[in-house]
Amino acid sequence: MVATFPIQPNIKNEVLDSKLGSRILKYAYGFEAPVKQVFGGIANDSLTFLTIGPKTDEKVNLGFQTDKISVDEASETVMFNLVNKERVSRGGKALVLDNKLRDIAREHSADMMKRGYFSHYSPEGKTVADRVMGAGIDFLVIGENLAYAPSAELAQQGFMNSPGHKANILSTDYNKVGIGAMDGGVYGKMFTQAFSN
């Protein structure tokens, strides 16, 4: 029998920070991907990773709200490098880091933590396209990946195990990315990847 259930963010952090726990977490994640293939969205909230499909209007109530957040530049850098490593290893071109897209991604990650939701849509119904247009950025194509995870590495691993998120990361339609990582302390980390041409 396999079961998955929500884990409080402070417990996730404690497990990730321990030497034994972090090793177990990596192995546990290896079991999650096959379970998600069998059970679909039922297993989208677990010890290691929470996400929703890149083109869905699904909304998840996080069960908390916090203003005690800070930009996690180190995680943004790690994730940016991991994204480009995946692209280049498959013969693709590296994405350029775009500061305007990064600011939009940071704002969305912060908004989700402050207002306790997890979605590509703000509570007012605004999408990544709306947010980018509102910032005066021109684009032909736009995409977004979201993850709530204890680390950039686990978030990126989760993206690469999800066909829709992986497609965004590897798409030749995009040449720019902005990554916004917000650290909510005991509440964990929120990641937004905003892709554009």
Over which residues does each language-model region extend?
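N-terminal targeting leaders of exported, membrane, and organelle-targeted proteins
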Residues: 1-107, 182-197
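Short, exposed beta-strand-loop hairpins at the edges of beta-sheets
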Residues: 166-170, 180-184
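Envelope-exposed proteins and targeting segments
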Residues: 142, 175-177, 189-191
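Short, surface-exposed glycine/acidic/tryptophan-bearing loops
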Residues: 102-152, 169
